Design a protein with these regions (language model features):
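Residue-level detector of Asp-centered blade-edge/turn motifs that repeat once per structural unit
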Residues: 22, 79-82, 119-121, 164-166, ...
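A short beta-strand motif characteristic of beta-propeller blades
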Residues: 49-67, 102-108, 146-152, 193-199, ...
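Hydrophobic beta-strand positions that form the internal "hydrophobic ladder"
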Residues: 26, 85, 124-125, 169, ...
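Short loop/turn segments immediately following beta-strands, especially the blade-tip
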Residues: 38-45, 181-189, 229-235
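Bacterial Sec-dependent N-terminal signal peptides
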Residues: 1-23
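Blade-loop segments of beta-propeller domains
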Residues: 53-84, 89-92, 100-115
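Repeated scaffold domains used in trafficking and secretory/extracellular systems
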Residues: 64-77, 110-119, 154-162, 200-211, ...
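Short, solvent-exposed loop/turn segments at conserved positions within beta-propeller repeat blades
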Residues: 87-90, 129-135
């Protein structure tokens, strides 16, 4: 028994390491800044920022990105197990940023970009809002910066989410929600094929978020709704019923955890609102726009 007893501390260490709960992180952006907080240890009086980056640090990009295209940030999606952050800006830029090195892995000029999503085959979908060159849904290849490989019209594009189970890309515009399939995706000339389109219950579509394999949350000027893909129906998202101008939303239907931002001063806010657990994270020096949860 003695040899076995010698290994017990090692077994315990390995077991505890395997079973340790990963820390929940919160990515937020506004103005020319993006930062990551440790969610559990952040309080209203002292948000615990563990990582940050600013457009001025993008020295590996053309100067116009640092001074114009990346100001202000309006999307900050953690992707690839949170090793990268997909950023968009209404100033006209998109960047895929490596978290560890803070190097740009992809960039493009996207007029009034408001959201983006990773797609199969190392491609990116971008929703562009109101701009003479915008109002569109664009597709890019990560290996080819600043080259649009497909484009469709989408008035006031604000959200894009890839639903893997359904093999559909959902896109949110001013007053409609669309579902696209991937066409000729393994070729050099990929396309999106519009499969379905639904009018949303209120104008001013803003955020689009996946909450399960079969459901999305849509936010707009007047309210937020859960969209059932199977039933093709919208139902009011009760935790935020009648809350106007929700700019970003994160929700776990299993735990009830809810994290969101809403416009409180023009289009921006100084607060991130959290429920289950309940707290308000306050940032008096930053005009915040969106926040995204990651593990």
């Amino acid at each position: 028994m003695k040899p076995l007893l010698l290994y017990l501390p090692l077994f315990a260490l390995l077991f505890s390491g395997c079973c340790a709960k990963s820390k929940q992180e919160l990515v937020a952006c506004g103005e020319d800044k993006v930062f990551i907080l440790d969610f559990e240890s952040s309080t209203e009086g002292q948000p615990n920022i563990i990582w940050s980056w600013a457009a001025s640090e993008a020295t590996d990009l053309p100067d116009v990105y640092r001074t114009k295209y990346l100001i202000p940030f309006d999307e900050c999606k953690p992707v690839d197990s949170s090793t990268k952050i997909l950023l968009t800006s209404s100033g006209g830029g998109i960047v895929l940023l490596d978290r560890a090195t803070k190097k740009s892995l992809f960039y493009a000029y996207c007029p009034m970009a408001h959201s983006a999503e990773m797609l199969p085959n190392n491609r990116i979908a971008v929703a562009n809002s109101t701009h003479p060159e915008g109002n569109s849904l664009e597709i890019y290849d990560i290996d080819t910066p600043e080259k649009v490989i497909f484009k469709d019209s989408l008035y006031s594009g604000h959200g894009v989410v890839w639903m893997y189970k359904h093999k559909l890309l959902f896109a949110l515009g001013f007053d409609d929600l669309r579902a696209y399939s991937l066409k000729n995706w393994d070729s050099d000339s990929p396309e999106l094929a519009l499969e379905r389109k639904w009018l949303i219950p209120s104008e001013g579509g803003h955020d689009l978020t996946r909450i399960s394999d079969n459901e999305l949350i849509v936010t707009a000027h007047e309210n937020s709704w859960v969209f059932s893909i199977a039933d093709e129906t919208f139902s009011v998202f009760e935790p935020l019923a009648n809350v106007h101008n929700v700019k970003s939303i994160n929700y776990n239907p299993l735990t009830g955890q809810l994290v969101y931002t809403k416009a409180e001063t023009n289009w921006w806010t100084n607060n991130i609102y959290c429920e289950n657990p309940e707290k308000v994270l306050h940032f008096p020096e930053i005009k915040l726009y969106k926040t995204r949860l990651s593990q």
